[in-house]
Structures are given as C-alpha cells and as structure tokens.
Amino acid sequence: MVKDNEIKAKISPFAIKEGEIKQFDGFEGYVSIVQITNKIDRNHITELEYKILEYVDKYEFITSRQINMLLEMDGIHIDNSRKMVKKLDQMLKTKLLSRYYFGTLEEKAAYKVYCLEKNAKYLLEAREVNVHWKPTDNTKPVAVMKRTLATNQLILAIKSKCSSYKSDEIKKVLMEGKENKLKANGFITFAQGITKIDVAVEAVRREQNWEEKLIARLNLYKEFYENFKEGENGLNEKPYILFVCEDKKHMAEVYKVMAMNKLEFEGKAYFTYDLLQMEESLQNTWHQFIHDEQKIKLQPLNIELLK
C-alpha cells in the first residue's frame, strides 16, 4: 500500500472536477444467493471477505487504499497489492461489491470506488449485522460520493495517527425533529484521561450551487445548537464541527459563506482540507478564523488531542 508520505498530489483526488461523471466498472450478469452459499461452503468466501463487506457497509463508498488501511489497523496484512485487486475482483464477480470510477472526457481518476451489492446485504444480515445499504445508494451522484470519500479519509487518518481517537460513526443523527433532521457526515470521539470531546465532520465539496447547500446545512446546525438538550442522541455536550474542504482556498470560501450569513458558530467551528490528512502528524492540521484588529486571519492550531 502506498504510504501517506509517498503521495505527492497537488490537488485532492476527492475535489470536484467540472464535467466529471461516474462510470460503472463492475461485472455484468446475475449471481444467485445459492451460488454464493456454495462458495461459502467451499471456503471461497472467507472471514476476509466478510471483514471487507463490513467496512464497505459502514463507510458506504470506499477506495481499495482505504480498505487496506482498515485491514492493517485490524492487524490483517495483505503483502501484495495484486492480491487485494484480485480479491476485490472476485467479490465483484460474485456481486458482493460494485465498483465505479470518475472521469471526464480528458482523463480518468486514478482510483476506483467500491460499494455494496444486494448479495452482500444478505450475507451480512445472516450474521445479524444491521446493514445500512439500500439499492438506490449506488445511484448517488459524484459530489455525494466524493463527500463521503473525503470524510472517510479524514476519519481513517485520525484513527491511524491519533492516540486519543476513541470511536467514529458515519451519518450520526444529531437532530431528529418533525420537520428537520440532521445527520453529520461523520462523527469522531476523542478521549484522553478524563477529557472527552465529540467532533461532527462536515465535508464540503465545490459542487453545483454548493454555497446554497452549505447554508441549508449550516441552518440545520444552528437549529441543533439552539435546541440542544443534554442526553439526546447520546450527546452530553455540544460537539464541535470540523469542516473538511477541498483545499486551503476553499476553507476561506466556506468561512466567507458562514460569516456573510452570520452562521460562524464561534468557538465551535474548525477547518481542514483533504491533503492535510496525508501529514505524518495531524497536530497542526486544524484551523480557525481569528478576528484580529478588524481583520480576519486563518490560524493553524496546535491541538494536543491530534498527537
């Protein structure tokens, strides 16, 4: 697996590109559940496949590199990248996974994105796993998929590099009212000694009309903060929000939208961007916008919890 410090990208692979579409890159045909159970009986589908399916179910859209990272964190080492490719291809052929890539007329993305298929749902439910996937999930547009991939990248970076990492949850419900419902893209809990901090992850992409969509999300967070009740949805304190942007300039663009609409969540909002997750240490990768003598400046922070 390519290490973080070996990645020399100047632009995030999860940034929005004009004219980019997603293309199906799986295998055509039908595979019955009877064929699947036969493969299980012959030990052609093992605990490794189940582990991968659980990852994909939890994180919804995921790259092979992210799968490898999760396996390594669980102490499972696949010493040859070709073995991983072969394993994933086998899971595609048996309709356990589906695969897509992003591309424009000029170029194709260097990575591919995996998601669940119906047969995987059956297998996981047989093991009493509460499967989140539904068939329409695979029809989600590029911007939604890239938002998910950026969220996953940040969570996995924290999980692998920060000793204070305690847990993560995808699409955690923060507010569930009659009219409005708010789910964080991701949710991370840090714990160090008696200190426990919750952070809601909000990935922002430069998709079409992204500013309007951001304002709608910010208003939901405003409602959540204003009506927060201790103990609801397992929260004892108001969480911080970490905005995951495409690049450094995008952090300023996101903050401008917040400031112009008086939705700054003073003291609660932090900012980072995709490529910073490749840093060896994440301690200085979060930022805040500071008001200083009638000026606003971007301030990198030194956060002990990110060591």
Task: List each model region and its residues.
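Nuclease-adjacent, charged terminal/linker segments that flank catalytic cores
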Residues: 1-128, 138
